[in-house]
Regions:
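Loop-helix junctions at membrane interfaces
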Residues: 1-211
């Protein structure tokens, strides 16, 4: 799937959200053209990075070269609410690109695995008021990763718990904790390290483009 296709779909989805807010008269959304463009770019970057899988789990989930970081950077610059919105849109796109397999487990599983899980990327903006941007971003990354982990844990426990015995686990809870932790922990570490090393420069670049 070409990069321009991801950008186009992102723009269409964000545009639809803006139109919906405009009809409702919600002036707080403030999705400017620059913000829309930056959101589309971040979604495209995350989508491309998500295709580079360093390790793929058998039942979904993978370790990538920080595919969530562009979404987290957007949340850190534009705020938690905007970050959550972008995460939901990205989650819908990921569901489409993954072929819609999660739909076989029901709507709730689909929501937990995609829109809700990636909406947690918005939590990366929780510490944006800190003076030290590297630390603030790193803390936000940890919180966002934990939020996504919780969504995946609940989904794995409730909807995929029947696979526990297949992988040698007695308890579906322990199975979900271990399974989702196996890819989320390394993914989080990669994102935190990059945030600590390059976060300050990346945030400044995004803020300059946002002006």
């Amino acid at each position: 799937f070409p990069v321009w296709g991801w950008v186009l779909m992102a723009v269409l989805l964000i545009g639809g959200f803006i139109a919906y807010k405009a009809v409702k008269g919600d002036k707080k959304s403030a999705w400017t053209t620059k913000k829309l463009s930056m959101g589309a770019i971040c979604i495209a970057l995350s989508s491309v990075l998500s295709m580079i899988r360093l390790w793929k789990m058998p039942m979904g989930g993978s370790i990538t070269p920080a595919s969530m970081l562009p979404l987290m950077l957007f949340a850190y610059v534009y705020g938690t609410g905007s970050g959550c919105t972008l995460g939901v849109i990205y989650g819908v796109l990921q569901f489409i690109l993954d072929g819609g397999d999660a739909a076989a487990y029901g709507v709730t599983a689909l929501l937990l695995d995609y829109p809700i899980a990636f909406a947690m990327m918005g939590l990366a903006g929780a510490f944006r008021s800190m003076k030290n941007e590297n630390v603030g971003l790193a803390l936000g990354v940890v919180l966002a990763c934990f939020g996504r982990y919780l969504a995946s844990f609940v989904s794995g426990w409730v909807f995929y718990g029947s696979y526990a015995s297949y992988y040698g686990f007695v308890s579906p809870v322990v199975y979900s904790i271990c399974y989702n932790g196996a890819y989320m922990l390394p993914e989080c570490i990669i994102c935190v390290l990059l945030a600590m090393l390059m976060g300050n420069r990346l945030v400044k670049s995004l803020k300059q483009n946002a002006k």
